[in-house]
Design a protein with these regions (language model features):
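Small beta-barrel nucleic-acid-binding modules, primarily SNase/OB-fold domains
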Residues: 3, 7, 15-179
Length: 179
């Protein structure tokens, strides 16, 4: 009986080691410098911003419609803002692999990053869904010319979003609130 138990343990441990080593050795990052993110480390804010272990991350290359942020003078949700937020949350939650490639910081001290879900740029998913405007033509490529070009191409081939560009909508909201 003991040899059978020992044999079973050896088989299970060998398989477990083999499976995990295959998984690790087959991992290929979606982009140079990409870092894998664990879902439990993510908190959701809106369509283009989330937190990673408490630090705010802003998705590069896009701008999604706003959701209410009274502390910033945005008192109501922009049309499609909830849809963009919910889509981002659903896509991230369902992804088997979440990666980000950190860039610089914005004026709000958020970390700027490209985000990949199962190898696809989140920015491109949002653009194709009509839930984001590209911002590459305004802010430049942020040191990622190839990714910026992919975002521009997706934007050219996607339907135009059915909402006011968020920077214009935000300006009007702040004027209404006196801020």
């Amino acid at each position: 009986m003991v040899p059978a138990v020992v044999h079973l343990c050896v088989v299970v441990l060998t398989c477990a080691w083999g499976c995990s080593s295959r998984e690790n050795s087959s991992y290929k990052p979606s982009y140079r410098g990409a870092r894998v993110i664990d879902l439990e480390d993510i908190g959701f804010d809106d369509g283009d911003t989330f937190s990673l272990r408490g630090r705010r991350i802003r998705v590069l290359g896009i701008d999604t419609p706003e959701i209410a942020h009274p502390e910033m003078g945005i008192l109501e949700n922009q049309p499609y803002g909830i849809a963009a937020s919910e889509s981002t949350m659903a896509w991230i939650t369902r992804a088997e692999r979440i990666e980000y490639v950190p860039g610089g910081r914005d004026r709000y001290n958020r970390r700027l990053a490209h985000v990949f879900l199962d190898g696809e740029l989140l920015a491109i998913r949002l653009i194709r869904a009509g839930l984001a405007y590209q911002t590459v033509s305004h802010y430049g490529d942020s040191g990622f010319p190839d990714l910026a070009q992919q975002i521009l191409d997706a934007s050219r081939n996607a339907p135009k979003p059915q909402f006011t560009p968020p920077h214009r909508w935000k300006r009007k909201q702040r004027q209404k609130s006196g801020g």
